[in-house]
């Protein structure tokens, strides 16, 4: 699916007004080979520790988008080239990170879409700390497990359920 976030916003102004469709703040940079992607959200809440990110990406993605609330940390990366390849191999369509990624050249050849705040060369800690399948606060929007994520070059949308055009 190739989302067109502008068309979805225009077609669902009522949902924007009632809050069942939300727009993330325009603070994310694009990485990965896919400029547009969509799917149901799997969520993680971590801080400078990507142990749970790896464990989640090792599981079947089944067309989902991994939404990682990394607390907006700009001090280390939560996703790198190896995890990008793992996500692609296991059927994840995309990753949205409220934090940093690294190995951008490697990620840019992965056949998934990735959005993150920035690139950072330092890897994260590995303490096995974090929460999965919880409600997370991303820049500008709350994301709950199972919400639908729509991403393209114009932005990131979060819908309570799958949108029809």
From Swiss-Prot:
Divalent metal cation. It is an enzyme of class 4 (lyase). This is Putative 4-hydroxy-4-methyl-2-oxoglutarate aldolase. Its EC number is 4.1.3.17, 4.1.1.112. Substrate binds at residues 80-83, 102. One of its GO terms (molecular function) is ribonuclease inhibitor activity. The keyword Metal-binding applies. GO terms for biological process: regulation of RNA metabolic process. Transmembrane segments: none annotated.
């Amino acid at each position: 699916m190739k989302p067109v976030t502008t068309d979805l916003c225009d077609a669902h102004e009522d949902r924007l007004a009632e809050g069942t469709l939300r727009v993330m703040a325009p603070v994310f940079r694009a990485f990965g080979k896919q400029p547009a992607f969509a799917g149901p959200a799997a969520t993680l809440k971590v801080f400078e520790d990507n142990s749970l990110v790896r464990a989640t990406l090792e599981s079947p993605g089944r067309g989902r988008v991994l939404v990682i609330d990394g607390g907006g940390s700009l001090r280390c990366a939560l996703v790198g080239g190896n995890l990008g390849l793992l996500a692609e191999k296991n059927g994840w369509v995309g990753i949205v990170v409220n934090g940093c990624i690294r190995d951008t050249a490697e990620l840019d050849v992965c056949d998934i879409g990735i959005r993150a705040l920035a690139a950072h060369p330092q890897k994260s800690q590995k303490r096995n700390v974090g929460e999965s399948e919880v409600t997370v606060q991303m820049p500008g929007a709350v994301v709950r497990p199972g919400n639908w994520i729509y991403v393209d070059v114009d932005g990131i949308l979060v819908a309570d359920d799958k949108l029809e055009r």
